A protein has these predicted regions:
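Short secondary-structure boundary motifs at beta->alpha junctions and helix caps
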Residues: 10-20, 79-119, 123
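Short, highly charged C-terminal tails/helix-capping segments
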Residues: 119-140
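Surface-exposed short loop/turn segments
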Residues: 31, 35-79
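N-terminal segment of the mature soluble domain
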Residues: 1-50
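Generic preference for hydrophobic/aromatic residues in regular secondary structure cores
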Residues: 1-5, 65, 89
Length: 140
């Protein structure tokens, strides 16, 4: 598990000595997304998500928050043509300024990330400008 002391060394990540994630953060986020975003048999498009940040950030000695930052891209069925792109940045206050508080905050932040992605994907399909083109590109 990584953390950053924003009040002292904002650009330097550090690791908790005795705390580890059960799996790499990207895998944990992927599992949560698969649960929240059921496969849509009507779409041939793919979603690519790059996880840029999965860190507990301490703004003060006794307060922290989870930061989950990612880049989402909706890709055409074949090739790497990007049909839509979105940057996401989710923060969630940790209930305690320690590793276990960070876990709770990251769980909530990851769920919120999935909710925002679901809303974004639904919005793309119903967008007045460009939504039809994306629907045609993603049609099976």
């Amino acid at each position: 598990m990584q953390y950053r002391l924003e009040y002292a060394q904002p650009s330097q990540r550090q690791a908790y000595a005795e705390s580890r994630w059960a799996s790499p953060p990207a895998e944990l986020v992927e599992v949560g997304l698969r649960r929240m975003l059921p496969p849509d048999g009507r779409s041939a498009c793919r979603l690519r998500l790059d996880l840029d940040e999965f860190t507990q950030v301490y703004g003060t000695h006794d307060g922290s928050q989870a930061l989950v930052a990612a880049r989402a891209e909706l890709l055409a069925p074949r090739g790497d043509t990007v049909l839509a792109r979105r940057d996401l940045r989710i923060t969630e206050v940790a209930p305690r300024p320690d590793a276990s508080g960070g876990v709770v905050a990251h769980r909530t932040a990851s769920r919120r990330l999935a909710e925002e992605l679901a809303g974004w994907l639904a919005g793309i399909a119903s967008a007045p400008n460009g939504g039809d083109a994306i629907q045609r590109a993603c049609a099976r």
